[in-house]
Amino acid sequence: RINSASTTGGKNRLISTFFRLNMGYADRYLFTFSIRADGSSKFADGNQWGTFPSVSGAWRISNESFFPKDGIISDLKLRASWGMTGNQEGIGNYDSRSLANGGHNYNGQDGIAITTLANPDLKWEKSDQTNIGLDLSLFNDRVTVGMDYFIKNTKDLLYDRPLHTTTGFSSITQNIGSMRNTGFEFNVQDSISSTM
């Protein structure tokens, strides 16, 4: 005999649109612009949509007339970019809304109790990143070198903030705090060729 049974479930929806434009001139000057809009059901009305642009440019110095063609460096490109991204992961499907659960008993009466506090002000966590880099190809492209310096700023971090026990709830999801990351990346690749 089954005395009681329960089940839980949930779903969320994400809608995205994307536009990208690539431009170049004489294989020396390169430009890219993109923008995307994402709509998530995890957020309340008014905060569901986020817009995230990005732009990048590059200068292939090795294709300029003043650049020596018979040197060690066979390709040289300077590039820079800036872009914004959004995050909606790490939170529940309904954290912007109150959730209630039935089956609670008080003084012999069945009832419904709120189990999750609503936060209709929840919004996208956003990160913007700036990159400055240099690409080198040496010895007729046998050796390639890449160098990057980046700065990443994240704001409106999605975080479960603990609440005092007197509230009857353990936490509430909020946009709290910010974070900054900086770093330098360096990579070298060597293509070894042999002849018989």
Predicted feature descriptions by range:
Residues R1-M196:
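Extracellular/periplasmic, surface-exposed regions of secreted and cell-surface proteins
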